[in-house]
From Swiss-Prot:
The keyword Phosphoprotein applies. It catalyses: [protein]-L-glutamate 5-O-methyl ester + H2O = L-glutamyl-[protein] + methanol + H(+); L-glutaminyl-[protein] + H2O = L-glutamyl-[protein] + NH4(+). The active site is at S167, H194, D291. In V.cholerae cheB2 is a pseudogene. The lineage of its organism: Bacteria, Pseudomonadati, Pseudomonadota, Gammaproteobacteria, Vibrionales. Involved in chemotaxis. Part of a chemotaxis signal transduction system that modulates chemotaxis in response to various stimuli. Catalyzes the demethylation of specific methylglutamate residues introduced into the chemoreceptors (methyl-accepting chemotaxis proteins or MCP) by CheR. Also mediates the irreversible deamidation of specific glutamine residues to glutamic acid. It is found in: Cytoplasm. Keywords: Chemotaxis, Cytoplasm, Hydrolase, Phosphoprotein. It comes from Vibrio cholerae serotype O1 (strain ATCC 39315 / El Tor Inaba N16961). One of its GO terms (molecular function) is protein-glutamine glutaminase activity. This is Protein-glutamate methylesterase/protein-glutamine glutaminase 3.
Length: 358
């Protein structure tokens, strides 16, 4: 496996290279900035690349953009845990980077060893991933400024809810689906995206700027409103519950029983207890692992509606594949088609999610 490490710090390049040397059959080269990286990508043609963001001569985002045009390859961003780092990293994911690792301590090389296993795991996985550049669709400032404001669902006796489970490759996929939903989509939507805390806040803010629907991070107990999108808080789990008889969601401490956080499994299980399977619309999207597969299969078997992203369109197909192994009959599609399916299901059911057989 040919790995290119791109960082303006010689010490950081050495530290990252030493971490990656433990990958079997790894052949590693380094680049000191974006221009050096592009030159080595074209001449050496690496299988995967790690990329810093802040560099002289040519920064990481400019380098990433040019590589995605000239010779796309899987790129893992190394970024800080700051809010600014989260915003820039999200932009990189939209531009085509397949994954990221948040560096503890920012530029402190010594602390990089804390995430050494994660760096190796993500670089190995990235080498097998599909590279996808998400098209940036524009929404006018006027459209965003006058978002569709829906009332709190006070008479929603069946407590109807839509849930998206997503991990690696998720931000662009989620935004594509939400952009293709009508402004009057009548269900609250919870997006469970595996991300650190500072990144989910930046993700929710980005979606809120770019979408017609209001978007909020679940950073406290919130009563769920129709037509509003909710992003689970990173480094926490999220559960669905009732507050004064109204459907609500709230963050909870991580449950060590689950491997990924926020946990799709825990979220969907709580939604089943609170709403019942037949009042749920669940969508499984791109990502590693099998988080939420068992619980979404239970929803499908309990007369709820479950869709999965077509695995061939995923950056990482593991999560949809895990669900399809359990319930192979559920509909699949591209992000755009999933938005169409969600819209049709909700329109046809009018006010109740009783769909019968799939």
């Amino acid at each position: 496996m040919k790995i290119l490490v791109v960082d303006d710090s010689a010490l950081m390049r050495t530290t990252i290279s030493d971490i990656l040397q433990n990958i079997p059959n790894a052949e590693i080269k380094t680049a000191r900035d974006g221009m050096d990286a592009i030159d080595k990508v074209m001449k050496w043609q690496p299988d995967v690349m790690t990329l810093d963001i802040n560099m002289p001569n040519m920064d990481g985002l400019t380098c990433l953009t040019q590589i995605m045009v000239e010779r796309p390859l899987p790129i893992v961003m190394l970024s800080s845990l700051t809010h600014e780092g989260a915003i820039t990293t999200l932009e990189a994911l939209y531009l085509g980077a397949v994954d990221f690792v948040a560096k503890p301590g920012g530029t402190i090389c010594g602390r990089l060893q804390e995430v050494a296993p994660l760096i190796r795991e993500k670089v190995r996985a990235a080498a097998k991933m599909r590279v996808k550049v998400h098209t940036q669709l524009s929404v006018s400032p006027a459209e965003v400024e006058h978002k569709h404001k829906s009332p709190v669902v006070e008479n929603n006796e069946d407590h109807q809810l839509a849930i998206m489970g997503v991990s690696t490759g998720g931000p662009g996929t989620v935004e594509t689906i939400l952009r293709h939903l009508p402004a009057d989509f009548s269900l609250p939507i919870i997006v469970n995206q595996h991300m650190p805390e500072s990144f989910t806040a930046a993700f929710a803010q980005r979606l809120n700027r770019h979408l017609q629907q209001p978007v909020k991070e679940i950073n406290r107990a919130l009563v769920l409103e129709a037509g509003t999108v909710y992003v689970c808080k990173g480094d926490r789990d999220c559960i669905v519950t009732l507050r004064d008889g109204k459907l609500a969601a709230m963050p909870t401490p991580n449950d060590s029983h689950f491997s990924w956080h926020p946990s799709v499994s825990k979220l969907v299980a709580s939604a089943i207890r609170t709403c019942g399977e037949d009042n749920l619309l669940c969508v499984m999207l791109t990502g590693m692992g099998d988080d939420g597969a068992t619980e979404m299969a239970q929803v499908a078997q309990g007369n709820g509606i479950v869709f999965a992203q077509e695995p061939t369109t995923c950056v990482v197909p593991s999560m949809p594949e895990a669900l399809l192994k359990r319930v192979p009959h559920i509909p699949t599609g591209t992000p755009e088609h999933l938005a169409y399916l969600m819209t049709e299901v909700v329109r046809q059911s009018s006010r109740e999610l009783h769909y019968g057989n799939h």
